[in-house]
Structure formats: C-alpha cells, structure tokens
Amino acid sequence: MEVRPFGLWPSPLAPGDLAAATRFRDLAWDSDGRTLVWLEGRGPQGILVCQPHGEAPRDLNTTLSVRAQVGYGGGDFAVARGHAYFVEYSGRLYRQALASGPAHPITPEFGSAASPTPSPDGRHLVYVHSDEGRDSLAVVDTEGHHWPQRLVTGADFYMQPAWHPKGDRLAWIEWDHPQMPWDGTRLMLAQLARSRDGLPCLRNKTTLAGDIDTVVAQPHFSPNGRHLVYASDQRGHSNLWLRDLASGETRCLSEDAHDVAGPAWIQGLRAFSFSADSHTLYFIRGENSQRRAHSLNLQTGTITPILALAGYSHI
C-alpha cells in the first residue's frame, strides 16, 4: 500500500472541476406563487433560472452575470408581477420578463446595488446603493424612465428594505461605524409620500428598535398590513418580535434560548415569513447546532416543528 503525507494523495477532482461546479445561491416565488426563480453560480457567472408550474426549468439569460457586490454580496435579485429584477456584475439593475424577451437596464452604471425590492404595485424599486464609500437606500421606477434618487441617507450602512403592503410605509435596517451588523443595528420605519416626478420620498422617519448593543434584522410586514415582525437579540438570543402597527404594542413571540437570525454577513438573508392569511409565521432557528423549521400560530402562540423541512437554513 502506498503511503503519502496528509493532503498529497491523488484526487479525482481537478481545480477546474471545482471552479465549474454549479452552486445554488437563492430562490424566490413570483407574486402568483406559480413560477419559481433561482440563482445558480456556474463558474464565474451567476445565472437566473425560471420554472413555471408544470414546465421544465430554463435560463432567463446567459449573457448577463447576476451578482450584487455591496459589502460581502447577497441580495442579488427579486421577483414580482411576472418580472425578475436583478443586479448585474457591473452594478446596474435590470428588469426581465419571466415569460420571454431580453433584460432591460433600469439604472445607469455607477456604484454597486443590492437587495432590489419592488413596491406592492410594481411601479418602483427600492434598493441598497453604495458609491465611493457612501451608502444609501435608493429608489427608481421599474421601467427605468427616471434617474434613480437617494431615498434614505445619513447612516453608514443599510440592508433589508421592506415595503408595507399598501406601499405607503417602508422599513429597513441601518447601522454605523464601528459596529458590524452582528454588533448593533437599528430598525427604522418611515411614511412615504410622492415627489414631483412621481417617485416616493421619505417623511416621519422613526427608530423602532435596536441600538449600538442590540441587533435587529429582517423586518417583514404581514400580508394584511397589521403587523411588522423582526428578529432582535435584546434579551440575549435572536428571537422573533411582533409590532402592532396601529397600537404600537410590541411583544416577543419566541422567547427562548434559540437564535432565529444568524450574523448578517451578506444582504438578502431570510429566516422567517408569513402565511398568505397572516395567521401563521414560518421560521427557522438554531437548535443543537442545527437549523430547524417551525410554524408559529399568531393567535395561540403555539410553535410546531416542520419535520419535512429538516436541514433547511433559509426561507
């Protein structure tokens, strides 16, 4: 038997095999729940793949590489109303119909973009923008007819913008130097108005949660618009919190020694989401060094494991 030092035995895999491997990055449903879109890394390229219900999967395009580059990346694309909105490697935002046709740029080529988030009516897109060390939340119309505008400025970093279902409010996460997003962040909420050119503009900005020693993450409005759910470690672990938007009352939904939201190394992370009727929250949390899926009945507070989704890490 041949003996070789550790790490020097022959391998059937060459470096080229690893570089050419397909990597699964993220996925999203279209608004109708019948078309699934996901992002594959194929060598140096990021390719969006689309699969309508009952049909074979197909590449949306192979000429543009999908890759967001704000911070450590992530938040590469979104899907809504029959269209995919994605960040191309150059930093431009594109819109492409899921049915057919080419992709069309909707922002000019400057800076970097991430986390494109379509408005409920499909007319506007809020996204994280970074240019020459200056970060902001920007807004542009989804047809690309107007020059994009800065919507939110003042903080050093931004992530996870979220529209209220009525389109009249926006929530997001922000933080400043020297904090990292796993040290201390702020959950912000603002009313939206319309500017003269029709783009949304900000008013009545409020800090809802978080500080330099508390991490809040992943704001998510309920489909009926009554509640805002987010993760916060204000009691030691990253638990789920629910805010009643009418009364302002906030309560912890999962006060236990399990973490729901992990460190936000990248944009676009998701660990929980609502059911369509707003009555149930589905989430993934760490238990015994594993990530496990659960459902939470918001009326009874009952938490139930989802055994069929064992091993899933994001929702």
Give the location of each predicted region:
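Beta-strand-rich domains and repeat architectures in extracellular enzymes and scaffolds
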Residues: F6-Q51, V66-A78
